[in-house]
Amino acid sequence: MLTVPGLCWLCRMPLALGHWGICSVCSRAARTDKTLCPQCGLPATHSHLPCGRCLQKPPPWQRLVTVADYAPPLSLLIHQLKFSRRSEIASALSRLLLLEVLHARRTTGLQLPDRIISVPLWQRRHWRRGFNQSDLLCQPLSRWLHCQWDSEAITRTRATATQHFLSARLRRRNLKNAFRLELPVQGRHMVIVDDVVTTGSTVAEIAQLLLRNGAATVQVWCLCRTL
């Protein structure tokens, strides 16, 4: 997918503001039309009430905000961001996430956070890639929402196996005690930002760490939730 300055990257129509990257029509079209549970982000009957899964076994976070399923066109843009070093895509993707957050605030009273945090990469992977995609999403979000962000709020204590090929049970085991909190969060309303949430094992481990250290609430914001 070629990105052309001044044109929408998806429909190729001229942009009113060239740096946005994605036009308002495509931004609206990128959103999922499925009814999602406000807590786990999976398909549900109601978008304002927790689903049966969350009532029986709630995740360790209170809200999950997502733009869409992990499918084209968003999946293609995320892949380019992560693996083709197209860091200019990050701002446009952050804007899509911002619009979804503001929509949730208008329609469901979503609470804005005191601080947002990135899902960290292991040092070697960060060095190889040259950036952490979660950092690139957090940076403009923190500026637009006037909340705190520190790229080193959470660090990885060890290397972990690639999650993609692991079952949900092995993912949880793989991530056990893999993160360390580097700053106080007592009484703070926290948001974990990631590009894609699949089983939720990574964000669940971080959410549990935040809650153990006194965070008042934890939300998860992601571009894509595997539905």
UniProtKB/Swiss-Prot annotation:
Pfam family for this entry, one: Pribosyltran
Gene3D superfamilies according to UniProt: 3.40.50.2020
Top-rank taxon: Bacteria
InterPro entries tied to this protein: ComF/GntX_DNA_util-trans, Competence_ComF, PRibTrfase_dom, PRTase-like
SUPFAM superfamilies associated with the record: PRTase-like (SSF53271)
Cited function: Could be involved in gluconate metabolism.
Family: Belongs to the ComF/GntX family.
Record's protein name: DNA utilization protein YhgH
Natural source organism: Escherichia coli O157:H7
